[in-house]
């Protein structure tokens, strides 16, 4: 496998891999990484769909990319923010037919939508019960804070292993708008991995200017299950791929010899009926190890989620622990799933039932939430919330079957263990109605109306996810297994806990990249995998980000010691009248 960039490789179709007709594939899980692997097996691997088998422990596909209507109401555990340079995602979705527009792909539909209705926020944060916090697009970083970020940016990965963000940032960064934007947009906590923070900075350096108002982001028309997962599953079923639901893979058997590691069997549990499937070297096994939504608990309007991080038999953590015990190259799951108090947060889906709540939403987001177009344009963070509450409305309806007079709001709190500001209980102990009350309080709803509106004008379903931030925990090389471990001949790891270079976790792109790389490696497909977008190597992006991170202040305005000021002055004299001077002026650096 090799990486590539540019249209030559992007538009090429690979030859059929040698020996693919005698191979079969077994995929554990049906999340985005697993479905991507299945799609690439069919599209570029040219494997017959009937020879691809997908095992899913739940009754529906999609993993964390959910969006369903249950008896208790609508549920979206999370949302997906997309980037125009998710190179693998767009490479695949250009081939997945739209379910709504004949002759169009999912990418076509997405591209047209975001051209016609570009994303941007009119209110990024609130304070004092619904007042605009007036972050005003500013990062609010001092020169010292900017230098702390720059230092992290240039620190070698090896020096960041097992380091926390607070090992590099002090209050100059942590009390700034920059950190407010960053931690709530990406769900970072202060104690999370400094290495992952650095990778994020380098990965999205071209979007620094678009973070304060979310112009950097793009969204699907509906929830991610209906907009992404269903089209992929339909494509796979149309090609004959076999899906097995309510089916847990509880163990994997390996033959581990010097120079050769082979998966030789999987133990499958379908509703209590257990069987072992033998695997040969021509049977390719794709393992989704770990899982950010494992052990989640769902509440209801009048039921709290509680907090139960127990790792249950047959889930992604249990399987990974069993596998990891066999060989050190299979990773170290305990680094990620041993401290659920440091990896959890809680979300809730609030469905409005009448016209009473939407007017408070419109007052803050300054848009008609029923227009079918962008509403909040990303999350609105309640800056003075004890739960650090954020909420968002994407284009409504978020579900195709959603009544047109209802809105689906997604809410999440980073601090599920802190008492609320209105409801004096931790979020994890609150019913859906009580979470809605806390949200309404921060919207500025009159206190005397809060209980009535939460009870009769909304239905709220909370979800506690003990391991939703597990991949952000500090780590060292080897804690996550390589996608295809050294000497592996017929198996690969998939998803957020498999290791690939330069890309960042908690994104659709990371999951899809692991799926593509796994297939390309095991089948030796002769076509380049799109490399991670290289803006970190683009001097234009670097200079532009340096200026915007300092809210437009020029390099000549930096607080420097005397010798630094003299050196800068002399350097500027040297470049006077050159293209370098023109370049720096073009990007307002001088």
Tell what function each PLM region has.
Residues 202-284, 288-290, 302-303, 308-317:
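Helical element adjacent to the flavin cofactor pocket in flavoenzyme catalytic cores
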Residues 1-25, 43-51, 69, 549-590:
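Extreme N-terminal leader/targeting segments of oxidoreductases
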Residues 13, 19-148:
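N-terminal glycine-rich phosphate/pyrophosphate-binding loop and immediately adjacent elements
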């Amino acid at each position: 496998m090799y990486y590539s960039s540019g249209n030559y490789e992007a538009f090429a179709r690979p030859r059929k891999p040698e020996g693919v007709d005698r191979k079969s594939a077994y995929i554990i899980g049906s999340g985005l990484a697993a479905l991507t692997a299945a799609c690439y097996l069919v599209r570029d691997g040219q494997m017959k769909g009937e020879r691809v088998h997908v095992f899913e422990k739940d009754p529906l596909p999609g993993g964390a990319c959910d969006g369903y209507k249950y008896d208790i109401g609508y549920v979206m555990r999370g949302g997906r923010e997309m980037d125009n340079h998710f190179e693998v995602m767009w490479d695949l979705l250009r081939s997945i037919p739209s379910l709504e527009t004949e002759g169009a792909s999912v990418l076509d539909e997405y591209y047209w939508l975001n051209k016609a209705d570009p994303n941007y926020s009119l209110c990024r944060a609130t304070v004092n019960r619904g007042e605009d916090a007036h972050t005003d697009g500013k990062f609010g970083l001092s020169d010292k804070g900017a230098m702390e970020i720059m230092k992290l940016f240039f620190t070698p990965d090896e020096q960041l292993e097992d380091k926390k963000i607070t090992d590099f940032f002090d209050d100059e960064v942590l009390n700034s708008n920059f950190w407010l934007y960053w931690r709530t947009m990406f769900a970072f906590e202060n104690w999370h991995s400094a290495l992952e923070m650095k990778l994020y900075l380098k990965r999205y350096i071209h979007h620094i200017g678009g973070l304060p108002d979310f112009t950097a982001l793009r969204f699907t028309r509906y929830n991610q299950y209906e907009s992404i997962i269903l089209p992929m599953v339909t494509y796979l079923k149309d090609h004959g791929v076999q899906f097995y639901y309510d089916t847990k893979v509880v163990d994997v058997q390996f033959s581990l010899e010097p120079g050769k590691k082979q998966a030789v069997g999987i133990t499958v549990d379908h509703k209590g009926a257990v069987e072992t499937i033998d695997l040969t070297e021509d049977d390719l096994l794709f393992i989704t190890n770990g899982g950010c939504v494992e052990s989640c608990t769902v509440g209801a309007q009048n039921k709290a989620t509680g907090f139960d991080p127990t790792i249950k038999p047959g889930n992604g953590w249990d399987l990974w622990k069993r596998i990891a015990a066999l060989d050190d190259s299979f990773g170290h799951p305990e680094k990620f799933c041993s401290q659920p108090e440091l990896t959890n947060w809680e979300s809730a889906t609030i469905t409005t039932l009448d016209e009473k709540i939407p007017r408070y939403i419109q007052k803050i987001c300054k848009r008609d939430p029923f227009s079918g177009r962008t509403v909040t344009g990303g999350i609105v963070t309640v800056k003075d919330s004890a739960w650090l509450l954020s909420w968002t409305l994407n284009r409504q309806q978020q579900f195709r079957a959603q009544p047109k007079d209802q809105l689906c709001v997604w809410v999440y709190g980073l601090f599920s263990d802190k008492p609320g500001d209105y409801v004096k209980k931790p979020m994890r102990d609150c019913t859906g109605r009580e979470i809605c009350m806390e949200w309404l309080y921060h919207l500025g709803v009159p206190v005397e109306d809060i209980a009535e509106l939460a009870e009769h004008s909304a239905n709220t379903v909370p979800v506690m996810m003990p391991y939703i931030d597990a991949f952000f925990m500090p780590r060292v090389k080897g804690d996550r297994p390589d996608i295809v471990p050294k000497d592996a001949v017929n198996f690969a790891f998939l998803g957020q806990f498999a290791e690939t270079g330069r890309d960042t976790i908690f994104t659709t792109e990371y999951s899809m990249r692991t799926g593509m790389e796994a297939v390309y490696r095991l089948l030796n497909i002769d076509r380049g995998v799109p490399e991670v977008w290289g803006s970190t190597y683009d001097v234009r992006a670097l200079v532009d980000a340096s200026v915007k991170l300092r809210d437009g202040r020029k390099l000549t305005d930096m607080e420097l010691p005397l010798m630094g000021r003299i050196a800068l002055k002399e350097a500027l004299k040297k470049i006077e009248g050159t293209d370098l001077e023109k370049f720096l002026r073009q990007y307002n650096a001088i």
